Amino acid sequence: MTNPKNVVPNSGTSSRHASIVEMLSSPPLLPHQHAQHAHVHRSQGRSESIESIPLQRSASGTSSITSMGSNNDSSSANAQSANPSAGSATNVGASGTPHSGSGLEAGNTDLSAVPMLQTPSQCLNSAHIHTWKHIQLSQLIEQNKLIFVPGSLSVEETFNTLIKYHLTSIPVEAVPGDMNCLTFDYNDLNSYLLLVLNKITINNKQVTQDCQNGKPVAVGDIVKLTPKNPFYKLPETENLSTVMGILGSGVHRVAITNPEMTQIRGILSQRRLIKYIWDNARSFGTLEPLLNSSLQDLKIGVLNTNSKPTSRQSRVISIQGEEPLIMALYKMHKERISSIAVIDPQGNLIGNISVTDVKHVTRTSQYPLLHKTCRHFISVILNSRGLETGKDSFPIFHVYPTSSLARTLAKLVATKSHRLWIVQPQEAPTATSSSSTSSSVNTGTISPNPTPTTTSASPAPGATPNALNNHSPLLSTVDDGHTVINPATQATNTTVIQPNLFEKEYRTGKLIGVVSLTDIINLLARKQTANTEVDPQTARRQRGPATQ
């Protein structure tokens, strides 16, 4: 998100962290709008609801995007079908069926021309105005972050590389210049940890013994433990329409190559695509009807716990707050998910545990955390985040059925998560109360009083004494540069959130659904491109079952 302090008036000094409400109030401004931002906001009066985000520019600007009105409702989409040279695009259910008569996309005639400016970002904005779905993939990749590791590298060294370059995944080459890489991510790190703890079994006895005896294990062996999709590749000359058909099927990332498809130029992930769309939302006028629609109107996410999800919907997977953390990690591995909701006995959402949080238990000194409750682990994560960044606000991982798609996108970008939990507030919300409730939760801060931790560690289910006592190279030598969480010293050094404060600020309602990056990209692909039949569960079915 760019310049969050400029989004809402009276946001305070530039040194203060912007609240999430400020970040969610509207998409980021375009570069050439900054100079006229104050005038635009004075003219609009900022009276609109947070849940309804107008994307049209002020008439006083140097250029304008016409608001989607009745004149555009009858327009037919003339999306081009996917390029036949798109490589693996057809492997994941991308359809070439023409998309017409949706009423959600307008022709290019309603968009005024933007003069070409000198800076690269402003030149890119001009391309957005013409048509967003035909933007070439070369505009989206970060070539400076293209990093590979050899399959012979140890897991701990690969993990250190992830931390060093702030990556969530990294391609693993079997041989130099390998164009069919597997990727190492935090799901693989979780599998490695579970193997060390003897919570899962694999057919390779040598790898199992090395893991449990603390010997280095090649990352090339570990990446094979977690079922993965094929390494999809697209040339950088392809466009957004094509890649949406792939990422909208549940594939998490796509390699972007040179036009000849002989060299990988970068990696485009679901999360980066969503951030790109949100950062440039003001340029994508045809998306306005979708962005201002609610999740329940768009029919994405599971919104009724009394009926089973359809074949195109994600299941709501949760764990009780009093269950041990090790069970949450095992459940994420078994279900092949990257985060899990933590609920109380009544089904109310009390928190979120992500597979990236496994980095907090990669040291042998942190083993006791594995046997403490999920509720306790959430408080430890929040405390650690406060020590590292100075932030005292709760991250918000939930939305409501009435939340707009724009608000959902903004929260996904702000939290850098792959999914948000849909909750039903304790009282049936109206259009006004829902926005008010969400605002009060989003701006909530914590000022916890020190509370000693007295929970004792107990062996994880299925973990042998040998597994608990060995010193894995990863668990003993990895230094991620962050605050080290040591349960042995928590009783005197750690500030833990009091239960009553924790529940007041973070418990927001009954868990009734989940909306993921795949759901949203799939929606955009079906409504705005030629990929009208793309199935969001295709990639999950391809991956098959995980290691038991």
Swiss-Prot record:
Report one GO cellular component: nucleus
Q: Where is this region: Disordered?
A: 31-109, 426-471, 529-548
Q: Per the record's keyword annotation, is Repeat included, yes or no? A: yes
For this UniProt record, give its keywords in alphabetical order, as a comma-separated list: CBS domain, Cytoplasm, Nucleus, Repeat
Composition bias of kind Low complexity appears in 63-89, 430-467
Supply one GO BP term. regulation of mitotic metaphase/anaphase transition
The family assignment reads: Belongs to the SDS23 family.
| Full protein name | Protein SDS23
Q: Which organism is it from?
A: Candida glabrata (strain ATCC 2001 / BCRC 20586 / JCM 3761 / NBRC 0622 / NRRL Y-65 / CBS 138) (Yeast)
Q: Its gene?
A: SDS23
